Structures are given as C-alpha cells and as structure tokens.
C-alpha cells in the first residue's frame, strides 16, 4: 500500500487470543466487573479486526468499525464465509466522506467494501448502520467514537456536529 512500509504481517489470531484470554479478564477483574455486556470498537485496521474477532467469539454484543480497513485483500471473501457470532446484535460502521476519494488502490474501494460489509451484516439479521462523517480517515475520532457507542448501547442513531 505504502512504498516505504512493508506489508501487514498478520498476527490477528495471536492478538485475538491474547486479548480474549489476558487483556479482557485482567481489565474486568481490576474494574470489578462480573460478566459485563461488551462492545468491541476499532479504528482502521483495528476496525477490521473488531469484525474479524466477532466471527470467532461470543464475547461481544456490539461491534463498531470506524473507517475499517475492509479494502484489505481477502477480507470480504473471508467474512462472507465466516458469519458473526449469534451474540452480536448491533454493528456500527462509519467512514469519512473523503476516504473513498483517494487515487491509491485498493484504498479507493473503501466505501464499496464497507457497503458490502453492511449488506452482509444485515443479511445475517443484525441491526446495522453506516454513518458518513465529514473529513477523512482519522478525523473527528472522538465524536465518531461517541456516535458508535450511542448506537451500540441504545440502538438509536445519533449524529454529531460532523455527521453527514
């Protein structure tokens, strides 16, 4: 994708195991939480990871992918053959309106790929929305996170100042 950087090295399965078996239990223990309802939110590559992880575990009831890297070669085919866990009830997707305007391939397919993901999620019977925001990939992260959490926790769409 970028000339000066190497290809992405994988490792999602190793991280997923570490996250589910170490990070979550340790964090919940320290916070005094017992069997909480969990939402998994990611931005960019971690946004793609959030959806990927939700195909393998019933640990989350909601998934948010903010500018998820669904352009990643092979992801859409993988997702089509690995549905989300039945535990997932809601999925929130968002993009910055400038993201699909790049000339760089395959990044310029991000809107089409995200719409494909939205369609698959809905075919699985999940509640899902795609929210467009002003700006590009990492713009207005705080507001986009708030929009995601409001939707996942309430099922109600909330549009902030930078939503379209």
Where are these regions (language model features)?
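Non-catalytic cap/lid and distal C-terminal segments of serine-dependent acyl enzymes
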Residues: 1-164
């Amino acid at each position: 994708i970028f000339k000066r950087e190497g290809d992405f090295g994988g490792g999602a399965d190793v991280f997923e195991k570490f996250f589910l078996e170490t990070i979550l239990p340790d964090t919940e223990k320290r916070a005094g939480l017992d069997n909480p309802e969990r939402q998994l939110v990611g931005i960019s590559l971690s946004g793609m990871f959030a959806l990927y992880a939700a195909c393998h575990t019933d640990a989350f009831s909601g998934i948010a992918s903010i500018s998820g890297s669904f352009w990643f070669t092979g992801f859409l085919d993988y997702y089509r053959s690995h549905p989300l866990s039945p535990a997932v009830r809601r999925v929130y997707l968002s993009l910055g309106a400038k993201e699909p305007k790049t000339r760089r391939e395959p990044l310029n397919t991000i809107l089409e790929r995200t719409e494909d993901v939205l369609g698959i999620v809905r075919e699985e019977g999940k509640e899902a929305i795609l929210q467009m925001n002003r700006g590009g990939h990492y713009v207005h992260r705080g507001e986009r996170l708030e929009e995601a959490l409001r939707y996942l926790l309430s099922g109600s769409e909330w549009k902030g100042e930078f939503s379209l």
